[in-house]
């Protein structure tokens, strides 16, 4: 042990452990576990339509512990298009049922409301559905703020969040960012 450092396992709150052909997919055991992360939280890689497939192919086969912030969109980040391209793909009841069936593996609900994700839809309309989903499932939201274009005040977004909700994508330079200039 004199030439090695012993550390507890790290927890990474925002990763994309998923099949490599999925939008942001990366191999968690190869890229996270090998660097000391023993527990990771997927940010919306799966939604209610593909949760069972994801659980069998990724979670059950990985050495690393993986927990999901289930995407508010039915297919999560499986396909290479904006996650909220179709407003109809946000099925509150289906998502709540999926969460109720796997409450230990699904720790929250993922909603990235950047322009790249919301497509032509108003982020406020998507957030309304996400909040209803979170209330009905009693789960926190992993929230990706909308900060470019700056068409929705950060303070107005934060006012919608509840205790235990988590904000991601906040360490950047610019409006709403926490990074020093």
What annotation goes with each model-predicted range?
Residues 2, 8-9, 34-38, 70-88, ...:
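Active-site gating loops and adjacent loop-to-helix segments of metal-dependent hydrolytic enzymes
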Residues 2, 6-8, 37, 60-66, ...:
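Short coil/turn connectors at secondary-structure junctions
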Residues 20-24, 90-94, 122, 149, ...:
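Short secondary-structure boundary/capping elements
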Residues 114-181:
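Active-site core of metal-dependent hydrolases
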Residues 20, 42-44, 84-87, 119, ...:
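Glycine- and other small-residue-rich loops at beta-strand/loop junctions that grip anionic moieties
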Residues 29-115:
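Divalent-metal coordination cores built from histidine and acidic residues
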Residues 14, 46-47, 172-175:
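Conserved mixed alpha/beta catalytic, RNA-binding, or beta-rich assembly cores of soluble enzyme
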């Amino acid at each position: 042990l004199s030439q090695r450092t012993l550390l507890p396992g790290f927890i990474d709150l925002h990763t994309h452990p998923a099949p490599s052909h999925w939008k942001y997919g990366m191999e968690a055991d190869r890229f996270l576990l090998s660097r000391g992360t023993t527990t990771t939280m997927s940010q919306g890689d799966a939604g209610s339509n593909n949760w069972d497939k994801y659980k069998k192919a990724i979670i059950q086969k990985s050495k690393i512990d993986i927990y999901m912030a289930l995407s508010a969109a039915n297919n999560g980040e499986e396909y290479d298009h904006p996650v909220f391209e179709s407003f109809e793909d946000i099925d509150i009841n289906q998502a709540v049922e999926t969460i109720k069936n796997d409450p230990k593996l699904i720790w929250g609900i993922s909603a990235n409301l950047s322009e790249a994700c919301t497509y032509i839809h108003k982020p406020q309309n998507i957030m309304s559905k996400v909040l209803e989903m979170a209330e009905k499932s009693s789960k926190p939201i992993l929230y990706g703020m909308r900060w470019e274009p700056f068409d929705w005040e950060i303070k107005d977004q934060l006012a919608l969040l509840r205790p235990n909700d988590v904000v991601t994508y906040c360490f950047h330079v610019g409006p709403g960012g926490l990074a020093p200039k």
